[in-house]
Structures are given as C-alpha cells and as structure tokens.
Amino acid sequence: MTDRTAVDPASPRLLAAGQRLDWHALTEARKQQRPRRAFVVDGDAVGSVDEVHLSALQPWGRWIEVRAEAVVLTASAAERDAVFAEVNARLHEQGLIRAWRDEPFPLLCPRTGQVRAVFERACARFWGTLTLGAHCNGWQAGPDGQAAGLWIARRSATKATDPGKLDNLIGGGVPFGQTPWEALVREGFEEAGLNPDQMARATPGRVIELNRDVPEGRQFERLHVFDLQLLEGEQPVNQDGEVAEVGLWPVDQACAAAATEEMTVDASLVTLDFLLRRQLLAPPTAAALEERLARLCTAAP
C-alpha cells in the first residue's frame, strides 16, 4: 500500500467520495434471507438456527429440543459447556460448523449481556448467537489537526473469513474473559505492533450491531468502535501474520474503498462511523448516511 501525501480533509476529492449513498455495508448489515428458528436459553432468545439444519440436532434431544416455535436448550447450566463441546464437535465433523479456531467465546444473552455458556468461537454463527467485536480506526492528522489519513490493512489471504479484503488497522473478536477494551489492547499489538501505552490513547465511538446471513450461518455481532490517532513516526507493524499489508490512505480514498465490497462489512461500517462523527463527509449526504447508520447503533450491553 502507498502512504499518503498531505490531504486537506475538506478537499473536493473527499467531498466527491462522500456523495455515495449506496454503501454496500449498510445494506448487508441486516440482510436476512434464510429462514431461521429462534434459539432459546433460560427463556431468552439468544440466537437462531437455520431451518435446514434442524434435523442435525435430533440426536441430542435430551439437551436440545427442536420445537415448532424455537430450538430450546434444556441442559442445565452445569452441563452446557460439555453439551456444546460434544454437539459442536459433531456438527463440525459434518461440515456444518467451519473454520474451527480453538478460541473460547461466551454465549451471551443479548438482552442482559450475561454469559449463559462458553463454546468454540466458530460455533457462534451456526447458532446465530451474539458475539462482540472491537475495531479501531487508526488515523493521522494533517497540518490543521483534522483527520487527513486512515491506516488501512489488507487481510491475509489465509484468513478464515474475508481473506484479502481491506480492513481497519485493528479489529478482532472479544473472547471469553475479556472486555472489548482488553481485546482491543491485545489486538493492537498482534495486528499493529502498538504497545498498551499507545493503545491507551484510543477513544470510543459507537456500538454497531450486525445481524445478517453469512456463509457460516448468521453473524449477530456488536462492534465496539474506537479511534486512535497515530503520531508522526508511529508505524504499525503486524505481528501475528494475519495482515498482508498496511498503509496510510488519504481519507477520501479510504472513504471511497469503504463504500464498496473491497472492504469487509465490519470495517466499512466502522470507517463510516469515523467519517460521520468527525464530520468529514459532505452534507446533505452525511445526514442521509447518518440516518441509516444510526439505525444499526445500539446502547445494549
């Protein structure tokens, strides 16, 4: 990727890039085309299961009841982790759960944020359960102090999801036992080589909720957005091999890329949140995009 030259964030090029209303990610964020049945734990709908996969759950009727209105987990709280370990391993063998990662993720109640069980990360999309993500817009100021450049990463071609697509400087899922902030600090080093003192400068944006069909099932995710200004001389360097390259893009070029399928849906929405909060898009287009993005934002836990 090519580093920027100084770009005025009020330049005509930025305004032109900001005229687009057809942001791919805004349409994709809630696209639901496959029929799914609610997945209920302790009386709360915590996810959903694709109706074509309901028959695969029949062998575990002792713990998982497939009812007309919902799939209900009847296993006790003490049994759940072991039940999920057994069931998910078999579903993985059958090819219904893909991209196994050996990362424990919490099964969260969307209403309360409480943890109802712990299972393998890759299983969340089969069950359509809520996951949390932490993403960070890395930005650099121009001579006037306004955002002139955004650090944009390209995902490794070997990534399990969205290989080779453009991404935010930092982004990742929040595993069991970590908060979004703690996950962000960890990912800051793994993905960009930034230490905790540098990451401490990050400031929060909004929380964006996706609930959409994906090849693995259903992505039901709350993205916690952060911004981090990188100072002159601070150069991100990937540490974990999950980033193919990273570069500093003029804001107008980052905006144009984020509006297309070249960038992941998650990263596109996180980038748009940054552009809107910092008033970098031309009105009245900004107002129309803000109205659409605001519908995706949540104050839920």
Residue ranges and their predicted role:
Residues 1-165, 172-186, 194-237, 251, ...:
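N-terminal leader/linker segments that precede catalytic domains of diphosphate-processing enzymes
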Residues 248:
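Short aromatic/basic micro-patch
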